[in-house]
C-alpha cells in the first residue's frame, strides 16, 4: 500500500527538518511518497530540503496559500492513502504503519482520525486538558457531533485518495478552518474510523496560524457549521466555540504570568 504525504511550507526553516525527519523515519509494510510544496521560500528552507532531495519530491513555486499548495500536492500524489503534515508538526514513530494496518483491516474505510497532542517549540507537550478533551470527543463521533464542535485533529487524519477525488478540495476562502470544511465534506460521503492511538503532534508556537487566529478560526468554523448543518447544530457550535476561545485566552493569560514570575 502506498501513502502520499504532502507538506506545504513557506519560510519554515525553524521546524522543517524536524517535520521531514518525522516522516522519512517512518518504517513498515508500505511505500512512502513524500511531496514537499514550497512557496518560494526566502530563508534557508530550500537549502535544508536539498539534503533530502533523494528521498522526497520537492516543488518550489508561488502557490498563493497553504491550501493551494496542498491541493497541488494532492494532484501530484499517486498513493492510495493521502494526508498532509504542516511544516511544523510531526508524526509519532509508527504512525504510517498503524494507518496502513487500519485501512487493511477495514477495507471499506474511506478515512480515519487518531489522537494528537499539542507541543511547544521544543517538542514538549503542552495544553494537556485540551488534548484530553478533544481525544475524549473522538470516541463519540457522529456527523452532528462534528457539526457542533470540531474535535478532529488535522495532523492525525488520513483518507483514501478515491475519497479525496470525490469531495471539494481545500477552500482558500478560509484562513484558519479549511480543514474543518474538508472533514464535513468527507463526513457527507463516509463515516471515519477512530484510531485510539497517538499518531501526531501539533506544534503551537508564536508564528503558527492557529496561535494567532483562533478567533478567526472559530468564526470560520461557525460559518461552516451553519453551511453544512442546521440552526440547532450551528447554535451548539457557537456555544462550544465561545467556550474554547475563552479557555485559550485564559491559558494565554496564565502562560504570560508564568513567564513574568
Placement of each model-derived feature along the sequence:
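Acidic helix N-cap motif at the loop->helix transition within catalytic regions
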Residues: 14-17, 43-51, 90, 94
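Short beta-strand/loop segment that forms part of the nucleotide-sugar
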Residues: 31-40, 59-62
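Glycine-rich, basic loop-to-helix element that forms the pyrophosphate-binding segment
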Residues: 61-77, 98
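A conserved acidic beta->alpha catalytic loop
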Residues: 22, 38-47
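Short aromatic/hydrophobic "clamp" motif used to bind/position activated sugar donors
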Residues: 82
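Conserved donor NDP-sugar-binding/catalytic core segment of glycosyltransferases
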Residues: 90, 94-128
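Short, acidic, metal-binding catalytic loop of nucleotide-sugar glycosyltransferases
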Residues: 21-31
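Conserved nucleotide-sugar donor-binding catalytic segment
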Residues: 128-220
